[in-house]
A protein has these predicted regions:
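Conserved interaction-surface patches within small, structured recognition/assembly domains
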Residues: 117, 173-174
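Extended serine/threonine-enriched, polar tracts that run as long, contiguous segments within proteins
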Residues: 169, 175-178
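Short hydrophobic beta-strand element within catalytic cores of glycosyltransferases
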Residues: 192-194
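Short helix-loop boundary/capping segments
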Residues: 143-149
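A short acidic, glycine-rich active-site loop
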Residues: 153-161
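Conserved beta-strand->loop/alpha-helix structural units within folded catalytic cores of enzymes
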Residues: 170-171, 183-184, 189
Length: 256
């Protein structure tokens, strides 16, 4: 019989093995990485670096809402380099592949939802305070080459991805090689795709949608402050018209 509780506990054996495999003893005993549930590690050949001083639980793997993906397992093939900041959450059903010469950077307060895929052949950076929804794919490579039959030109199959600070990537989106986004970008799901540099071409705090994604709305930002969300929810329980705020946008939106 399926044991729900077993999926919700820290996997002590995998947590110990992971930390003592990738960190020096002085850091491993702090257990900077905590692993829940079943988590397959395909390769221990790579290395992990931290953006801040290693401390307890700075990266949490396989943590999730059991309603969404209770039976999904995560997979890590780490041949290259994984760089993590503080308070990074990677939810259940994650598939991460980091090639030998590649780097994946997850900055402070990055949250990656259930059943996502990240394949890194070159370099992928996800900026601080960025949230990623479920079932989204990041690939910085086309994996194969194509030739222009008239010019004979063959372009590289790999190109880095750089997701800006405080982005919100919706569920069921695709982030392809060469994608670069400004601060505060929202990529609406499902089925939006980005594969180019938007920095300097669109303002910060834009909502993108489509395949390929284009600007749909400007001057829009996700509200991450829990108290603010409660205030807005209470407003809509009693009103049909939009909520109007005239104070400081930063304090209104930032997590508390």
């Amino acid at each position: 019989m399926f044991d729900v509780n077993s999926r919700l506990r820290i996997n002590i054996i995998k947590t110990i093995l992971f930390n003592f495999s990738f960190f020096p003893l002085r850091d491993a005993i702090k257990f900077p990485v905590l692993i829940w549930g079943k988590f397959k590690i395909a390769s221990y050949k790579g290395k992990i670096e931290t953006l801040v001083k290693p401390h307890w639980g700075m990266l949490k793997l396989e943590i999730s809402d059991p309603v969404r993906s209770l039976s999904a397992n995560s997979y890590l093939d780490l041949k290259g380099k994984l760089v993590i900041g503080a308070n990074v959450l990677i939810h259940r059903g994650m598939n991460i592949e980091i090639d030998k010469e590649a780097t994946l950077i997850l900055e402070d307060n990055v949250s990656i939802g259930d059943n996502n895929t990240i394949i890194t052949k070159d370099n992928i950076r996800i900026g601080a305070a960025t949230s990623v929804g479920n079932n989204t794919t990041f690939m910085d490579s086309d994996f194969h080459y194509v030739i222009n039959t008239q010019t004979g030109i063959v372009k590289t199959a790999n190109k880095s991805i750089n997701i800006g600070i405080n982005n919100w990537i919706g569920g069921n989106c695709i982030i392809k090689k060469g994608a670069i986004t400004p601060k505060g970008t929202i990529l609406a799901g499902p089925f939006s795709m980005i594969s180019k540099n938007y920095v300097g071409k669109i303002p910060e705090n834009c909502l993108l949608a489509g395949c390929p994604a284009k600007v749909v709305v400007e001057n829009i930002r996700r509200v991450k402050n829990i108290d603010t969300e409660k205030l807005i929810s209470e407003w809509f329980r009693n009103h049909d018209e939009p909520f109007l705020y005239k104070g400081d946008i930063e304090s209104f939106c930032l997590p508390n």
